[in-house]
Curated annotation (Swiss-Prot):
This is Bestrophin homolog 18. It comes from Caenorhabditis elegans. Residues 416-456 are annotated as: Disordered. Forms chloride channels. The chain crosses the membrane at residues 29-49, 83-103, 234-254, 267-287.
Length: 456
């Protein structure tokens, strides 16, 4: 059963992590306690031999051996190896979950496009869902131990109602050296085709929609099989597991508290390997994460709930195509038809802090408040005669003002005294655009460009 902890960490608090640390099921403690107990027992055994059995001369040799091994513990690149290993395993895990197969899309398209209240139409809709789910059952029982225990044989699949006796007879007629996962999908597609021929589907496009949903479902299950058939190369998890276990096996000797150490002459004899125990929890726990995600079809606490998904898909699919078919509510005006929409909250939540408006981080910045006129020119001054320029009259308090659009710099100087402005009415707080046109008087006097340049 998947361990759910989302409610415990719904809100971040300084003590939130305690809700996870003191859990047992699915925790790091339940994953490493056996290895840690064995390692700690061996550590104290070696420590007792050093303290109470070895002679003084033998202790000196032991100290030199401890120094030699401890100085070379960094030769094993655990951080690098575990980091790449966990990253690769985690990507496989989430991809498998994405394609594991939820039947909702097939059910919704089937209920929408296969029309009719007759028993025949209802049989079409229900059997399409059942055939798709039958394939998922056949695949899961070959991948997941939980599903295998539930359906040890095909007879148990038929007894559970996923396959009718005559369907199992047709299934057994095909003698094939490989898996027959394709057969229920063929039945489902054939039903879609027959429903179109009988007029239960109104157009070929709707046949394509239903067929595409079935195809996506089938493709996802095919990739699930591919990932099970071709796992990560065995040398990869082997070398990572070997590195972690060998590191701490050598650490039984290297992390002993000894007297007269040349590497750490000021070593405090704590008897208990406190810092090494912390390191053991982190590294061994990290390795257990990878081992748990390497094959999510087992019976670990966080493995996929295949039986739950099978039950959920069949129940949800049949409910959608049966009770959910053609049950549209009566069409009426909504509550905001004649009124402005105002967000409503419960009285308890209405006093909470307002949520952040999704705007740009600089949307509230107003540039050009102290400038009365802004001249927009091309970066290349040699093109001033052929490129349109703009002069913006900044309105007080708005940050953006009237935009004057001469056709060119020469036209601006020629027609500045004989042009008029065309005003576009805007709402309060917005800006107006004034365009200079040749031969028209202007209401807003504009200084010639040469005077503006002299002022600069």
């Amino acid at each position: 059963m998947t361990v759910s902890y989302n409610q415990s960490v719904a809100t971040s608090r300084p003590w939130t992590f305690l809700a996870l640390i003191f859990r047992w099921r699915g925790s790091v403690w339940s994953a490493i306690w056996i290895q840690y107990s064995v390692w700690l027992g061996l550590y104290f055994l070696v420590s007792a031999i050093y303290r109470f059995i070895l002679s003084a001369y033998q202790q000196q040799i032991f100290v030199r051996l401890v120094d030699y091994v401890n100085s070379r513990m960094s030769y094993v690149p655990l951080d690098w190896m575990l980091g790449f290993f966990i990253a690769g395993v985690l990507r496989r895990f989430w991809y498998l979950y994405d394609i594991i197969g939820f039947i909702d899309n097939i059910a919704c398209s089937t209920a929408t496009y296969i029309r009719g209240d007759s028993e025949r139409a209802k049989q079409y809709r229900r059997n399409i869902i059942r055939y798709c789910e039958l394939t998922q059952v056949l695949i899961f029982r070959d991948l997941s131990m939980k599903a295998r225990k539930r359906f040890p044989t095909l007879d148990t699949v038929a007894a559970a109602g996923f396959m009718m006796p005559h369907e199992k007879a047709n299934f057994d007629l095909i003698q094939y050296n490989y898996n027959k996962y394709f057969l229920p999908f063929n039945w489902a597609w054939a039903l879609v085709y027959n429903a179109r021929k009988e007029g239960l589907i109104e157009g070929d496009y709707y046949v394509t929609v239903i067929s595409e949903d079935i195809k996506k479902f089938r493709t996802g299950l095919a990739w699930v099989c591919n990932y099970d058939w071709v796992p990560l190369p065995i040398i990869y998890p082997t070398i990572v597991c070997l590195a972690v276990h060998m590191y701490f096996f050598v650490g039984i000797l290297a992390r002993q508290y000894v007297k007269g150490s040349e590497i750490d002459p000021d070593m405090i004899d704590l008897v208990f390997p406190f810092m090494t125990s912390i390191q053991f929890v982190f590294y061994m726990g990290w390795l257990k994460v990878g081992e748990g995600l390497l094959n999510p079809w087992g019976e670990d606490p966080d493995d996929f709930e295949t039986n739950m998904l099978i039950d959920r898909n069949l129940a949800m699919g049949l409910k959608i195509v049966d009770e959910g078919y053609d049950k549209t509510p009566r069409l009426e005006k909504d509550a905001f038809w004649d009124d402005t929409w105002v967000p409503l909250y419960s009285e308890a939540s209405a006093h909470e802090k307002r949520y952040h408006q999704r705007q740009g981080s600089l949307a509230h910045i107003k540039i050009g408040r102290s400038v009365s006129q802004v001249r927009m020119v091309p970066r290349d001054g040699r093109r001033a005669s052929i490129v349109k320029e703009r002069i913006v009259n900044v309105k007080p308090g708005s940050g953006i003002g009237d935009i004057l659009r001469p056709s060119s710099l020469l036209n601006l100087m020629k027609h500045a005294s004989s042009s008029r402005s065309l005003e576009r009415q805007r709402s309060p707080g917005s800006f107006r655009m004034e365009t200079l046109t040749p031969g028209s008087p202007t209401n807003t006097p504009i200084e010639p460009i040469d005077k503006i340049d002299k002022k600069k």
